[in-house]
């Protein structure tokens, strides 16, 4: 599982707790990276690795394929409209894998050719791609 814009690492940690064998979390902020590492130590999690860096630089070099990619970018991220293409064109999503992008109401991915559905929970939207 790949957790992009990992923040506090909650999604990756939850995936580990639900049986994910390996999680890679990418976060640019040093404070959040340290928080994730600290939480993993406290919880005894050994199969979550944290990469501190820019998500787009990570993606440009990534060669690993994932069955689940979750991205929670800042809603005002300039590259947000192109994020599905940036990820999917890298060919890092396994066949039958899922890409999930969290976003606000002002972003609409429904016209993307690999968009499957969008779910809304209050002001938060999750768009699913295959």
Show which residues each predicted segment covers.
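Class I S-adenosyl-L-methionine-dependent methyltransferase catalytic core
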Residues: 1-130
């Amino acid at each position: 599982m790949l957790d992009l814009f990992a923040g506090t690492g909650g999604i990756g940690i939850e995936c580990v707790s639900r049986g994910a064998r390996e999680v890679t979390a990418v976060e640019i902020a040093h404070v959040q990276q340290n928080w994730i590492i600290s939480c993993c130590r406290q919880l005894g999690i050994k199969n979550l690795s944290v990469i501190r860096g820019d998500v787009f630089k990570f993606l440009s070099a990534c060669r690993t394929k994932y069955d689940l990619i979750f991205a929670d970018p800042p809603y005002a991220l300039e590259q947000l409209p192109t994020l599905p293409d940036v990820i999917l064109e890298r060919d890092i999503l396994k066949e039958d894998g899922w890409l999930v992008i969290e976003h606000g109401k002002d972003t609409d991915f429904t016209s993307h050719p690999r968009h499957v559905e969008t779910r809304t929970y209050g002001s938060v939207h999750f768009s699913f791609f295959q």
